[in-house]
From Swiss-Prot:
GO terms for molecular function: proton-transporting ATP synthase activity, rotational mechanism. HAMAP family: ATP_synth_a_bact (MF_01393). Keywords: ATP synthesis, Cell inner membrane, Cell membrane, CF(0), Hydrogen ion transport, Ion transport, Membrane, Transmembrane, Transmembrane helix, Transport. It comes from Bordetella petrii (strain ATCC BAA-461 / DSM 12804 / CCUG 43448). Key component of the proton channel; it plays a direct role in the translocation of protons across the membrane. The keyword Lyase does not apply. SUPFAM superfamilies: F1F0 ATP synthase subunit A. This is ATP synthase subunit a. The keyword Magnesium does not apply.
Length: 293
């Protein structure tokens, strides 16, 4: 095994930027380590959530029946878009009273969390060094990531919430007995002794379906945002390769600026698209919970 000193500066740079501010003070050793709390993800996700709540509160407070201003028109456009999607997917009007605002909140929340990836990679670490909070190992903010959706815990936590809502509406609409019955009798319907033989297979397929929906919903958001964050780090390494006023350094510097600009512009699309996909799948999965096989 290679010694720690054998790690290249580029690898060390990326590894450092991928470590969270957590309660153990170092990188967690396994993917699922339930005794680890990533304080940075909790802080930034809570902060962006509060900003979304404040944004919607201001929009509701400033709403008027007259000619809308630019801010009100912008908010109404977003609300109408989400409401139209909800009406086409969740047919139960009573359920939509909760599901449509939920979808709107999730959409805006994910957009804001994803948008944190557009902050320059080394901006916050530089601020921490200047303030003395992250200059050396052991300092409070030596490890700190500001992109919650690139932390597997956040997207999977949100997808778990969607899964619980699927169970809730499935039980509410079909009643407990009907919900449990559907687990054992769909998608392969049969009667008599054949139904007993098919019951285990039906249950297994339904459990796999629920698990696949939940895992894929969270992993899709996490994978895209983690990859985007990693690309920004690789682009930052081009600028970090500056060794002086020479052809190679100038070329890498120009490449750093061009690649960073192009990727940032493209990443805006990813930020919006991933939020829209998560919102739409949330509506689809909750809508499916209202329907029978």
């Amino acid at each position: 095994m290679a010694a720690a000193s054998d790690v290249s500066p580029q690898s060390a740079y990326i590894q450092h930027h991928l470590v969270h501010l957590n309660n153990i003070g170092e990188k967690q050793s396994v993917i699922a380590q339930f005794n680890v709390i990533n304080y940075d993800s909790v802080f930034w996700s809570a902060l962006t959530g509060l900003v979304v709540v404040l944004f919607l509160w201001l929009a509701a407070r400033r709403a008027s029946a007259g000619v809308p201003g630019r801010f009100q028109a912008f908010v109404e456009m977003i609300v109408d878009m989400v409401d139209e999607q909800a009406k086409g997917i969740v047919t139960n009007a009573k359920s939509r009273l909760f599901v449509a605002p939920l979808a709107l909140t999730v959409f805006l929340w994910i957009i804001l969390m994803n948008a944190l990836d557009l902050i320059p990679v080394d901006l916050m670490p530089t601020v921490w060094r200047w303030t003395g909070l992250g200059a050396h190992h052991g300092d409070p903010l030596y490890y700190h990531r500001i992109l919650p959706t690139a932390d597997l815990n956040v997207p999977m936590g949100m997808s778990l919430g969607v899964l619980l809502l699927m169970f809730y509406y499935g039980i509410k609409i079909k009643h407990p007995g009907g919900f449990v019955k559907e687990l054992f009798t769909a998608p392969f319907h049969a009667h008599g002794i054949a139904a007993l033989f098919l019951a285990p297979a039906n249950l297994l397929l339904n459990l796999i379906e629920y698990a696949a929906k939940s895992v894929s919903l969270g992993m899709r958001l996490f994978g895209n945002m983690f990859a985007g964050e990693l690309v920004f780090m690789l682009i930052a390494l081009l600028g970090g390769a500056w060794t002086g006023l020479n052809a190679a350094s100038v070329g890498l510097g120009i490449g750093h600026v061009l690649a960073g600009s192009v990727w940032a512009i493209f990443h805006i699309l990813i930020v919006l698209l991933q939020a829209f996909i998560f919102m739409m799948l949330t509506l689809v999965y909750i809508g499916q919970a209202h329907e029978g096989h």
